Curated annotation (Swiss-Prot):
Bifunctional enzyme that catalyzes the oxidative decarboxylation of UDP-glucuronic acid (UDP-GlcUA) to UDP-4-keto-arabinose (UDP-Ara4O) and the addition of a formyl group to UDP-4-amino-4-deoxy-L-arabinose (UDP-L-Ara4N) to form UDP-L-4-formamido-arabinose (UDP-L-Ara4FN). The modified arabinose is attached to lipid A and is required for resistance to polymyxin and cationic antimicrobial peptides. It comes from the Bacteria. It comes from Escherichia coli O81 (strain ED1a). NAD(+) binds at D347, D368, I369. Homohexamer, formed by a dimer of trimers. This is Bifunctional polymyxin resistance protein ArnA. It catalyses: UDP-alpha-D-glucuronate + NAD(+) = UDP-beta-L-threo-pentopyranos-4-ulose + CO2 + NADH; UDP-4-amino-4-deoxy-beta-L-arabinose + (6R)-10-formyltetrahydrofolate = UDP-4-deoxy-4-formamido-beta-L-arabinose + (6S)-5,6,7,8-tetrahydrofolate + H(+). One of its GO terms (molecular function) is UDP-glucuronate dehydrogenase activity.
Amino acid sequence: MKTVVFAYHDMGCLGIEALLSAGYEISAIFTHTDNPGEKAFYGSVARLAAERGIPVYAPDNVNHPLWMERIAQLSPEVIFSFYYRHLICDEILQLAPRGAFNLHGSLLPKYRGRAPLNWVLVNGETETGVTLHRMVKRADAGAIVAQLRVAIAPDDIAITLHHKLCHAARQLLEQTLPAIKHGNILEIAQRENEATCFGRRTPDDSFLEWHKPASVLHNMVRAVADPWPGAFSYVGNQKFTVWSSRVHPHASKAQPGSVISVAPLLIACGDGALEIVTGQAGDGITMQGSQLAQTLGLVQGSRLNSQPACAARRRTRVLILGVNGFIGNHLTERLLREDHYEVYGLDIGSDAISRFMNHPHFHFVEGDISIHSEWIEYHVKKCDVVLPLVAIATPIEYTRNPLRVFELDFEENLRIIRYCVKYRKRIIFPSTSEVYGMCSDKYFDEDHSNLIVGPVNKPRWIYSVSKQLLDRVIWAYGEKEGLQFTLFRPFNWMGPRLDNLNAARIGSSRAITQLILNLVEGSPIKLIDGGKQKRCFTDIRDGIEALYRIIENAGNRCDGEIINIGNPENEASIEELGEMLLASFEKHPLRHYFPPFAGFRVVESSSYYGKGYQDVEHRKPSIRNARRCLNWEPKIDMQETIDETLDFFLRTVDLTDKPS
């Protein structure tokens, strides 16, 4: 049976050997070039392929049409992936009539995603395994063909568990590959309600946070022990690595991070104490704990820290342009909740952020981004992270004021992007779900979905196209000039402080605010073209938590990424949104202050938005990038969001002259 193989690492080598032993004909192997910054303790797929006389390739993007065409010419009957690090597009998977199969290092549906070997140790699991599953468009989500369980011993570290998993994988493939070859397999669908997903780990993720329990820190040490980069901490600005450790149930009143003793080297934790058995100072040699203490100049009572002392003293400076807006004010609240951010903001108003004005780490200037260019350039240069959130983002304005939309949303933001390039500052740019336009995919995918808009004589697309072009400009600056960026695409975020009722009175607001105004004033709820258009509504708290994690950027996982932030489970039509809102309104304690419900009224989009409007029937996000990069899932049910949004707006209404 002819196959094309995607493989890397030891698992890739043993997968290839297993295929050859089972009588498969391997037409080509796709692998990766080795990362010079990664310790290569594993077998070389490229070398094995060369020794076996099999063509081998390592393209930067195997999903490029040219590579897709070359793979199609190979006419594979079946495709296998063994620890290949890039997602393979559905078009390639469909080339094999017998399907595509992937070997994953966990007991799916648990631990989907990257680095499951390390994550199970970090989380203190006592069992893991290997899974062979059918490949589908969503990573690690296809039906399970075979699994083999592997026990995790208390003394297992990453390398010993790796060897166990390789042994199990070899057994699994020996048992299963002949069955696939003869079409004699039983597939079991994964239970989505049991799925967990974890993102890529980097060396920077392995710092030891001493306020955590000793058992948690010991698991971290196990998870990244040599040949992985190791768990680390600091004495002042001196970094050191912990290669092995033991947990002590030591009852101590010492502050977490304090040295309890130096022989053995025992560190107080949030619960218990951690003995550093072996470690390494800087780029030095490995030594026992007591010698490490001497090398680092530690004595009883010394304090360790999770980051360099110089870094601990300086807060990250975040510049938010449009800080008074819906996202801006909620994000400010989230950042100021932590003690390591300094927020600088600019906006033309301050009503939503008045609650922060006396905060010592919040700095606000009232102004217009089209006028205060010198202030903006200075603060881009001064700050570490830039979020240009200023935009006209209400549909009626796209047809009412298309040139103003272009001038503000595109031209003013392009200038800010160029400042970030000039001063080499990280930009987190708000793209939009609107860029997908009339895409027909079931789930809108950041990396694969086409961006489809209407003709030029439909000005409603000027916002979508302005944002899309900025996305492309930012991407190009990242590729060609090293701009550090992340693009995030909100999908119908809603919650308190979304627009205001005055904006709704002139039609310049989002859907839920307009519907609330209709209820408050006793006017009919207008359903544009029947209100059958479906959207996925996302609670602002879920959205802001994802955005906060992008700013945190653990392990730089968000660099160069496009991330949808939405809740695919909260899909509803505008009509259904109106009905849910009405039900919440009718049982609200302030209901008696407002007029009777005036009913629903169907109106044509052209009469409401004006000439040149087109709508989109559905807009559902794929959130695999958010899961992978942020370890994020939306949690808040749509009804809860509706109730809280309605309550906020009803309590902003002056009730003094309303009937009781």
